[in-house]
Amino acid sequence: MAKRTKKVGIVGKYGTRYGASLRKMVKKIEISQHAKYTCSFCGKTKMKRKAVGIWHCGSCMKTVAGGAWTYNTTSAVTVKSAIRRLKELKDQ
């Protein structure tokens, strides 16, 4: 069978419905939510989304709460770096 979604990718299932700009937004979200992420516990690229905000590693079998569409949210990364920086200041 011929490849039908060269430009639109994963949002080809919507056809011509909902408008091009909305489909582009949804494409970005759907690509990130279906991607595999690196597990912060075992380091393998096995972290997959189970449900909204629930992520499961197929290697070490850990289940963690994360972002709705991505494993790490921007605010979580900011908080994690701030905590790490404060721990370093405390140790000095």
Swiss-Prot record:
InterPro entries with a match to the protein in the record: Ribosomal_eL37/eL43, Ribosomal_eL43, Ribosomal_zn-bd
One Gene Ontology MF term: zinc ion binding
Gene of this entry: RPL37A
NCBIfam families xref list: eL43_euk_arch, PRK03976.1
Record keyword Ribosomal protein present: yes
C4-type zinc-finger residues: 39-60
Domain of life: Eukaryota
A GO term from the CC aspect: cytosolic large ribosomal subunit
UniProt similarity note: Belongs to the eukaryotic ribosomal protein eL43 family.
Binding-site positions, Zn(2+): C39, C42, C57, C60
Cellular location(s): Cytoplasm
PANTHER family per the UniProt record, alphabetical: 60S RIBOSOMAL PROTEIN L43, LARGE RIBOSOMAL SUBUNIT PROTEIN EL43-RELATED
Keyword annotations of the record: Cytoplasm, Metal-binding, Ribonucleoprotein, Ribosomal protein, Zinc, Zinc-finger
Function: Component of the large ribosomal subunit. The ribosome is a large ribonucleoprotein complex responsible for the synthesis of proteins in the cell.
Descriptive protein name: Large ribosomal subunit protein eL43
Entry-linked Gene3D superfamilies: 2.20.25.30
BP terms from Gene Ontology: translation
Subunit and partners: Component of the large ribosomal subunit.
